[in-house]
A protein has these predicted regions:
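Juxtamembrane/start-of-transmembrane alpha-helix segments at the extracytoplasmic/lumenal side
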Residues: 460-478
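Alpha-helical transmembrane segments
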Residues: 480-494
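Register position in tetratricopeptide repeats
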Residues: 402-403, 436-437, 470
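Selected alpha-helical membrane-embedding segments in polytopic membrane proteins
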Residues: 508-608
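Hydrophobic alpha-helical transmembrane segments and adjacent short intramembrane/lumenal linkers
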Residues: 577-581, 590-692, 697
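TPR/TPR-like (Sel1-like) alpha-helical repeat modules
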Residues: 435-457, 483
Length: 716
């Protein structure tokens, strides 16, 4: 009989399980997503005004020269001249800012001999106007003046300087204001080559150390010396491109990023995976990551899916725009992501496709004034994008903040917010303005609108201190008045003292005593629970009131704790339902499961006894959650650990009372109590599973009946 029932249950479960639709959490399709969007502070995709719009496309025919063979890089100088690097034809095409041909550099004189490039991959222009070319297959960096005359070259470091260079093939090059040269070479993972102005090898910068997991450490402990030495050679990071900003720091990007690790990093918001880095002269990463998420490009992607449009962003270039702003180019989706100096995402534009403003194989980008130029390798063309008023306002606000023009900055953010109500960045900017003017209440409003909990926390501290200074005289006066009143009350009470009147024991009086008894139980759990059952010191009515109070405390904590620590969205969820789920449902599940288990384990408690001791055990929740709610309003964001500790103390205290209540009610030993609690938890999970299964079956039956009825109605 039992075997037959089990077989039927298993078949039924299998049918239901495999008939359920497969749900997957995925972002909006990349193919259908608008090219103008943003991510809010919760990682949700939101529509945003256009930041940069397509202006025109530049090809070799537009310049008036032979077709490009393979356009791989672009650069510009201080005069606005544009340099197009053609890898296949091994030449440089130079135009003015209007894309009129100035010259083509294909060959040059090196000493007394003719020389030329061989499959060059990268180009950079110094502040002096000199041209630096990563001459890949010749294994050197060629330096030319602005007219294309040979100045010199930088070859590979010798073996004494670098033991890791086997075949030196530079792919990207950059030069700073001091003429220090930085080179990325193919298949070199020790970092970026750094050369002095004279061409002397200075060492590597930006090398990334490996963080092996436990399995790698385990196998490494059994490896030989040669195996350990070999294992060091495959792990460091290989950069894909570099750029120098206006403060002479080095921006670099990484294209090969572990999608799974990056996805976990986005969820935790730790910023430990760094596809974008800003390095100082020592090679230390000084990238600021104060944004809601680290600067990683796309936030919503499937880390287990790979392909032309799937997975993490693939950064192939980076360009600095001044004022700490920078843009990175994602070749996977053809999008440009722009961030400010704090790591806040400002705007996104571009996309993959054949339309104007879209790319097939984007490979390089530069700023030319306010314009952004993006090179497309497969089309052998450059698309020019111009900023909209929205992008200009953002840049103006950032520039005005950097120069100390805070009133103008506020007006810029205000205009942005008027045209784009979803701009959390604008609300943060306005909140910062009010904060700097000591208008903390207004600052709190804007920081809350911006979902900026960090600055909200800082403003709360200032606001509380400001209120404290304003009400301090009234508080002192009130304390004095209360002290005097308390003393007078004591004197009057003594004078009017009489023999205690005989109290009449009513239902209300008994209920009050039963509620007060919950405190005795909290302080003396073993004696308290024994008397609760055997001396009838409590009742179901008081237990129900305690259950309702605990549920209410949970609802208030979920809904009304300070914004600094509160991620609850009343538009998406119900605090009442969450409060009931967190307390009432758990208590009821416990009662049913515990009664079921103790019935089989010679328990002495009835269902009423179990219900009473469980509800009386909730007093710590009733005490600690309101305390945590109030304390949350005076704690900074760094006080999250203290807030968690307060609620954790309540939960641990409650768990101890549940243990004592189970032991006293059922007259169990320590070991049997532990076993009963463990089995009760398992029973709760089974009941919950059966409940969900029943609901699912009912839904399937209703859907089936609905489908049949529709089919019948259509046939008739």
């Amino acid at each position: 009989m039992l075997k037959s029932f089990c077989r039927k249950a298993a078949v039924l479960f299998a049918l239901v399980f495999f008939s359920l639709p497969v749900f997957s959490v995925s972002a909006e399709s990349d193919a259908n997503r608008s090219s103008s969007y943003l991510y809010d502070s919760e990682g949700n995709v939101i529509s945003a005004p256009q930041s940069y719009v397509y202006s025109n496309t530049v090809t070799a025919s537009d310049i008036g020269t032979a077709e490009f063979g393979e356009l791989v890089d672009i650069a510009n100088d201080k005069e606005g001249n544009i340099y197009f690097l053609d890898k296949k034809n091994s030449q440089i095409t130079v135009t003015d800012k209007g894309f009129k041909l100035i010259r083509t550099i294909k060959a040059f004189t090196n000493g007394n001999e003719a020389d030329s490039f061989k499959n060059p991959s990268g180009i950079a222009i110094s502040d002096k106007g000199n041209i630096y070319v990563a001459d890949t297959d010749n294994g050197r960096v060629v330096i030319l003046d602005k007219n294309g005359n040979f100045i010199g070259s930088i070859g590979a470091p010798d073996k004494k300087e670098s033991q890791y260079v086997n075949q030196y093939k530079p792919s990207k090059v950059e030069v700073d204001k001091s003429d220090r040269v930085y080179v990325i070479a193919e298949n070199q993972t020790q970092g970026i080559f750094s050369f002095g102005a004279s061409g002397k090898f200075m060492g590597y910068v930006g090398a990334t150390k490996v963080k092996p997991n436990l399995a790698e450490l385990f196998f490494r402990s059994f490896a030989s010396k040669s195996q350990k030495k070999a294992s060091l050679q495959f792990v460091p990071t290989e950069y894909s491109n570099i750029a120098i900003d206006d403060e002479n720091f080095l921006f670099c990007v990484i294209s090969a990023v572990d999608g799974k690790a990056l996805s976990e990093d986005i969820q935790s918001r730790n910023g430990t995976v760094d596809p974008v880095r800003r390095l100082n002269q020592d090679g230390t990463d000084i990238t600021i990551k104060n944004g809601s998420f680290p600067p990683v490009g796309e936030l919503t992607f499937d880390p287990y899916v790979y392909g032309s449009y799937a997975g993490a962003s693939n950064f192939v270039d980076v360009a600095a725009c001044g004022g700490g702003m920078y843009s990175v180019l994602d070749s996977k989706r053809g999008r440009v992501f722009t961030y400010d100096s704090q790591g806040n995402l400002l705007y996104i534009f571009g996309g993959r496709g054949d339309q104007r403003g879209q790319f097939n194989q984007p490979c390089a980008l530069i700023y030319n004034g306010d314009e952004i130029l993006v090179a497309d390798r497969s089309r052998n063309s450059v698309q020019v994008f111009v900023p909209t008023e929205y992008a200009k306002l953002i840049k103006s606000a950032i520039t005005e903040y950097n120069t100390g023009e805070y009133d103008k900055e506020y007006e810029s953010w205000k205009e942005i917010a008027l045209n784009f109500s979803g701009s959390e960045l604008a609300y943060s900017g306005m909140g910062r303005y009010h904060y700097n003017n000591a208008e903390y209440s207004k600052a709190l409003e804007y920081f809350k609108m911006a979902n900026n909990r960090k600055y909200y926390s800082v403003a709360v501290k200032k606001y509380i201190a400001q209120i404290g200074r304003n009400v301090q005289p009234f508080v002192i006066s009130g304390v004095i008045v209360l002290f005097i009143a308390f003393k007078l009350y004591g004197v009057i009470k003594k004078r009017r003292a009489k023999a205690p009147a005989v109290r009449r024991r009513t239902k209300l009086t008994r209920l009050s005593e039963e509620l007060k008894y919950s405190w005795y139980i909290a302080m003396h759990p073993f004696d308290g629970f024994w008397d609760l059952k055997h001396e009838k010191r409590g009742g179901a009515g008081a237990a129900t009131i305690l259950l309702a109070a605990a549920t209410l405390a949970n609802v208030v904590f979920i809904r009304f704790k300070a914004f600094t620590f509160n991620t609850f969205d009343p538009e998406q969820d119900s605090a009442i339902l969450k409060g009931i789920e967190g307390v009432t449902i758990i208590v009821l599940l416990w009662c049913v499961a515990n009664w079921s288990m103790t019935t089989l384990m010679d328990g002495k408690g009835t269902m009423k006894d179990i219900y009473c001791y469980m509800c009386y055990s909730l007093l710590p929740v009733i005490i600690m959650l309101p305390i945590a709610t109030v304390v949350s309003y005076v704690l900074p964001i760094e006080g999250a650990a203290l807030l968690n500790m307060i609620s954790t103390v309540g939960i641990i205290w409650m768990a101890f009372l549940v243990f004592c209540g189970t032991s006293a009610t059922h007259n169990y030993s320590f070991g049997k109590t532990v076993a009963t609690i463990a089995l009760t938890v398992v029973g709760m999970l089974i009941i919950l599973f059966l409940f969900v299964l029943t609901i699912t079956l009912i839904q399937q039956i209703i859907a089936f009946i609905s489908l049949i009825s529709k089919e019948i109605s259509m046939r008739t």
